[in-house]
Amino acid sequence: MKLAVYGKGGIGKSTTSCNISVALSKRGKKVLQIGCDPKHDSTFTLTGFLIPTIIDTLQAKDYHYEDVWPEDVIYKGYGGVDCVEAGGPPAGAGCGGYVVGETVKLLKELNAFDEYDIILFDVLGDVVCGGFAAPLNYADYCLIITDNGFDALFAANRIAASVREKARTHSLRLAGLVGNRTDKRDLIDKYIDCVPMPVLEVLPLIEDIRVSRVKGKTLFEMAESDTNLAYVCDYYLNIADQLIARPEGVVPKEAADRELFSLLSDFYLNPKSNTTKSTADEEELDLMMV
């Protein structure tokens, strides 16, 4: 199974990806995480350091693929998760999609691409041009990381459009949204009412999730010394279980930009109407409970 993880820049894709990878590994799956970001820091939480990129390795070998060995580019991370960083072209030059293609090509040359139960592509930001949408060409499922905010959901809608486009050529599905570090989900619910798609999990606003990134550790590793964090790991294990079960997923029909802008901005501009609706729903629920 191949997964592509997208979301607004800074939303916590890499932290979420690393923890999902460990959760999948703990469920007995052999996992490879491929970082698809020129910053090459996707797997930092798994390895604790910035591993050399495939592009750097290929350049050092003058692009002689036959001179590259698996141990040159694949690094073992926490929980037995194997890690690769694609890297990227110099700033302002080249195409990230080309880099992803070269990464997949090399892994196939090394007979490594088919050795894993699950390959997870962690893709930079919400830039879904043809280049950085390239991982969707290889993926069975796309996951979108979001929060309960306007910008993240607007980005999610654009990513959903990319999924729909790529699904024309192969059996790609959107597995669903993962809410990251948010105490509320009312705006998420408002969005999925407009653009139906599953929500796999919503992680609460837990400071340790953010801190784990700085420490270069997954929540699972941190929980080894702080058992109070074990409950946080359960969120990621729940996501892993849903993915292992191969969800049906959806081919989303994204909202038009203006329609979505109006829908989401109304939530902020007219909070009273939203509060009134919420209160009415609660009163109805109370009556039903009686």
Curated annotation (Swiss-Prot):
SUPFAM superfamilies: P-loop containing nucleoside triphosphate hydrolases. [4Fe-4S] cluster binds at residues 95, 129. Pfam families: Fer4_NifH (PF00142). It is found in: Plastid, Chloroplast. This is Light-independent protochlorophyllide reductase iron-sulfur ATP-binding protein. CDD domains: Bchl-like. It catalyses: chlorophyllide a + oxidized 2[4Fe-4S]-[ferredoxin] + 2 ADP + 2 phosphate = protochlorophyllide a + reduced 2[4Fe-4S]-[ferredoxin] + 2 ATP + 2 H2O. GO terms for biological process: light-independent chlorophyll biosynthetic process; photosynthesis, dark reaction. It comes from Porphyra purpurea. It is an enzyme of class 1 (oxidoreductase). One of its GO terms (molecular function) is metal ion binding. Belongs to the NifH/BchL/ChlL family.
